[in-house]
């Protein structure tokens, strides 16, 4: 047997040598996430994405990202049990411009409302806004004791439940069908739809804790940058200077020519 060096061991250098560890965060950039103008607090956080390399563009990795934000953080309100989903639709500079993508109630709020001795009434409906967004709205409500009621339970009859459900669907359809997405979101923030349902159903059976508990985005129209910029309060007069930036008109005599400068 020929005595010689094992070439396979010497080829790769020192056996068991460690690979050079590259920090993955050195290849990433931070982007600001901007909420639409309907909300009080516009800057909701930051997100990471790998820098543009060859054909892999950073902005493509950001588009379509969904952020779930509590209404407390969007409106600077301590008591808020609604969560809004915002989806990135465009990237401008280091800013991700988002649009409404859905809404939900927090789990603890939902569980705190479900109790014994009352009837829970739920309804859902698919509605299209005036600007072409197809939404599915889910509503929930609970029966409550009438004034001076002695009986412990407050159960509604099946016929009353059907009437209330019909009313819920009518009001949700009416409120969404006649408005665009921006106006619908403005109604969802204080939940004025739930309050309208509560008032309308008072004659059938008194209700309490009536909320639009969930909103799903089913279909969207074709993306338009102009509409997104309007949502972020930058549409229309985006190119016009405002306030101090606007210049003042200077009066010139007819046939005025500027003097020739000696050096530029």
UniProtKB/Swiss-Prot annotation:
One of its GO terms (biological process) is translation. Keywords: Cytoplasm, Nucleus, Ribonucleoprotein, Ribosomal protein. One of its GO terms (molecular function) is structural constituent of ribosome. Residues 242-255 have a biased composition (Basic and acidic residues). GO terms for cellular component: cytosolic small ribosomal subunit; nucleolus; small-subunit processome. InterPro entries: Ribosomal_eS1, Ribosomal_eS1_CS, Ribosomal_eS1_euk. It is found in: Cytoplasm; Nucleus; Nucleus, Nucleolus. SMART domains: Ribosomal_S3Ae (SM01397). Its main location: cytoplasm. Residues 232-264 are annotated as: Disordered. Component of the small ribosomal subunit. The ribosome is a large ribonucleoprotein complex responsible for the synthesis of proteins in the cell. Part of the small subunit (SSU) processome, first precursor of the small eukaryotic ribosomal subunit. During the assembly of the SSU processome in the nucleolus, many ribosome biogenesis factors, an RNA chaperone and ribosomal proteins associate with the nascent pre-rRNA and work in concert to generate RNA folding, modifications, rearrangements and cleavage as well as targeted degradation of pre-ribosomal RNA by the RNA exosome. Component of the small ribosomal subunit. Mature ribosomes consist of a small (40S) and a large (60S) subunit. The 40S subunit contains about 33 different proteins and 1 molecule of RNA (18S). The 60S subunit contains about 49 different proteins and 3 molecules of RNA (28S, 5.8S and 5S). Part of the small subunit (SSU) processome, composed of more than 70 proteins and the RNA chaperone small nucleolar RNA (snoRNA) U3. Belongs to the eukaryotic ribosomal protein eS1 family. This is Small ribosomal subunit protein eS1. The gene is RPS3A.
């Amino acid at each position: 047997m020929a005595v010689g060096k094992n070439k396979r061991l010497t080829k790769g250098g020192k056996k068991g040598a460690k690979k050079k560890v590259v920090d993955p965060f050195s290849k990433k950039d931070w982007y600001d996430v901007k909420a639409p103008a309907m909300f009080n607090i516009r800057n909701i956080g930051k997100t990471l994405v790998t820098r543009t390399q060859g054909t892999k563009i950073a902005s493509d990795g950001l588009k379509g990202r969904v952020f779930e934000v509590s209404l407390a953080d969007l409106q600077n309100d301590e008591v808020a049990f609604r969560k809004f989903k915002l989806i990135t639709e465009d990237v401008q500079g280091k800013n991700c411009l988002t649009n409404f993508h859905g809404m939900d109630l927090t789990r603890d709020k939902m569980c705190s409302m479900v109790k014994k001795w009352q009837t829970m009434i739920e309804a859902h409906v698919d509605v299209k806004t005036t600007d072409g967004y197809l939404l599915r709205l889910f509503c929930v409500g609970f029966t409550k004791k009438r004034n001076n009621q002695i009986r412990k339970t407050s159960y509604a009859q099946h016929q009353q439940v059907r009437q209330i459900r019909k009313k819920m669907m009518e009001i949700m359809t009416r409120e969404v069908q006649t408005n665009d997405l921006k106006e619908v979101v403005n109604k969802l923030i204080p939940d004025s739809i739930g309050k309208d349902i509560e008032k309308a159903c008072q004659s059938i059976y008194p209700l309490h804790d009536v909320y639009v508990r969930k909103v799903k985005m089913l279909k969207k129209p074709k993306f338009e940058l102009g509409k997104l910029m309007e949502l972020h309060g930058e549409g229309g007069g985006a190119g016009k200077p405002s306030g101090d930036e606007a210049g003042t008109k200077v009066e010139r005599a007819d046939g005025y020519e500027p003097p020739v400068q000696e050096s530029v």
